[in-house]
């Protein structure tokens, strides 16, 4: 069975498919045809409702084209101020999964999300039949993880119902259905664990999914690391180490309801603009970038304080030893926002800046790798790639901070036991204890 990594984004959606033939693995990004019929690696997360109430998805304007004749990068899509005669709906993903007020009600956003996901499901089932399992990402922190995962499952189950039961895989009939009628046909299905297993749906925090290609390739050194995924609507952060099984051990998941939308004040932009893409760093407002960076710093400071607190509890060593250990730790950047140099900076001890590129991927297994790399799409496609790496379960949880020092604590306990046994052998006197006391 194929594994589909479904990265439902605020600005654009990316899909990667893992094909497994015996021991051979291949990863291929699903391509979407724009209004000119040119294949693109991303689909704009935009819905257009025309004067007749009919809905279009993704590429709304015939004016958006690939002038080079090649698959182009996100940034080269020219932002058109007009070109679609009707209502344009954007940022429904952000309104579905965050508390950001962007003018769309929660329930309306959920319905838009169901329809948009359905649109992509039609194409996936046309190409692969039903021989695939979806692994989808969600923006979340540790506290909201289960609720956010359930929301994703409900949206996917509702979309499957529309595609397979209501429209019987007839995409044209789906597109001919006016919005009001489509709303009447749509049911927001309650969460059901059995249905989740039936469809082999797995859901992962977006900040976790980004880690998988790097971990599989042994691209991150052991020790404490930070991943920052700057998206359109949110910025997701994971604090993790690599365990002896070469899998990430997550100690903190954080999601900030600020991404490129906030940085560019997109909510007050021209609503008729077709493209959601940020074309250059000049669109990022300085005062908003400073505010954004302060929120990241706040997360890092919280991490630092928690680490220091646990270190003092569990160790007799000076705090400077922890400070030294945190010097020049990796901070890994991914997501569309990370493509701008001004957005990649060190935070506290995390000073070794890594930007996702071809060298962090298992490039020999990725179809069109050279083209994707040349277009600078690796950080944009990274989450969908990570999501497509087949997993057996999605029981991801944050381990307690005290366990970061578990091995260190066990070594200290073992040393203490040795001292005790040595002292007993000499009638309760231990030269080791005496030396420690002198030190």
Predicted regions and their residues:
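Early-domain small/polar-rich strand-loop-helix modules and first-structured segments
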Residues: 1-96
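Nucleotide/phosphate-binding catalytic cleft detector across ATP-hydrolyzing
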Residues: 1-10, 16-26, 84-225, 388-402, ...
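Phosphate/oxyanion-binding active-site loops and adjacent basic polyanion-contact surfaces
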Residues: 66-70, 101-120, 144-152, 203-207, ...
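A solvent-exposed, charged loop/short amphipathic helix patch at secondary-structure junctions
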Residues: 77-104, 267-291
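Gly/Ser/Thr-rich loops at beta-strand to alpha-helix junctions
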Residues: 10-12, 139-146, 231-236, 337-341
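Glycine-rich phosphate-binding loop of actin/hexokinase-like ATP-binding domains
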Residues: 4, 11, 15-18, 24-30, ...
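Glycine-rich phosphate-binding loop plus the immediately following alpha-helix
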Residues: 39-52, 242-302, 375-378, 438
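Helical "lid/coupling" subdomains associated with nucleotide-phosphate turnover
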Residues: 276-439
